[in-house]
Amino acid sequence: GWVLDLVEKVAPIGLDPCGHELAESSRRARACLFQGSSSHELILVAESENKDYHFHNDGLKTAWAPLLRGAVHNRQKAELVFVNPPYGRELKAWAAKMAAERDCAIIALVPARVDTAWWRELDPVAWCALAGRVKFLDSEGTEQDAAPFPSAVCLLHATQLLSKFVEVFQERGPVYVRVHE
């Protein structure tokens, strides 16, 4: 979809830690952790030359940086983690995980709930308040009704991607940049 097209203009997606085998983000990522249909285990798969990535992992418990191509040093990695977390009760845990993964460049699509504790914990470098409501796709690729809440795309930890993020997302809604460090 268009959100992923914009994300890929900022940087290539290296990892989708909470993907699904039918999700477009999981197909675009070099590697993803996805929930198997018969269990609650998550399986890492790679679509590139790294076909030996077949581990049972939990996206909330597995360190993300080692799964990206090459080493990550001082948050200068161009390849990023794209996170579209479950929007239910698990969202708080995913927000804490994203905040903790400080060695990864992360772009996340989340509900724009700026008044919540989990949002404050995210503390994005920048975020775009998307104009309108996002329409998600079902497993067949059919567009569903618009989300009943506003959405935001957040950039976390990756100050080196800030100018590109602003350039790409400013046409989709206002972009807010953190002024404290």
Where does each model-flagged region fall?
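Class I S-adenosyl-L-methionine-dependent methyltransferase catalytic core
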Residues: 1-181
